Amino acid sequence: MRIVVLFGSEMGTAEKVAEAMADELNGSEVAVFDMSEFDLADLDPQAFHIIVCSTYGEGDLPTGAEPFFEALDAQQPDLTGLRFAVFGLGDSVYDTTFNRGGEIAAAKLTALGGSQVGDHARHDASTETKPAAMGREWVRTLPFDTRQLSMTAGTAG
């Protein structure tokens, strides 16, 4: 099974978390993409998708995620069969909009037929927990067997 990690960032933290997750899944078939450069046609129901998304401004999606979600809104693709997990980044100082970027991402993908699996992670910048470290730990809890992924990486499907 292929794993696709998509990140949407404003200041680069989501990218660092996405790269840390890919490192943690070393040996698996993992590809990391900036959402701003990802083509919706490449959303593959056979792959497992990890969405790493920060929150910007008043609870908005970050600039780096806007093109991806604008394309989703415009094209309305059928995402039935697409499995995804979400790692959100935010700051609890912004109580009412804390981690809203990840929540928006999950809602949009689910509304189009995608299935969110695993715990929705919500990193809080107001804590001492480093986002990349939390991402590494969280990715190990996702409902796929990395040993199985390693064995199938590189095989024709």
Residue positions per predicted region:
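A short, well-structured beta->alpha microelement
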Residues: S28-L40
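Active-site neighborhood of thiol-dependent amide/isopeptide-bond enzymes
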Residues: F7, M11
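Extreme N-terminal starter segment of soluble prokaryotic enzymes
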Residues: M1-V4
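FMN-binding flavodoxin-like domain, especially the glycine-rich phosphate-binding loop
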Residues: G12-K16, D23-E24, S28, P45-F48, ...
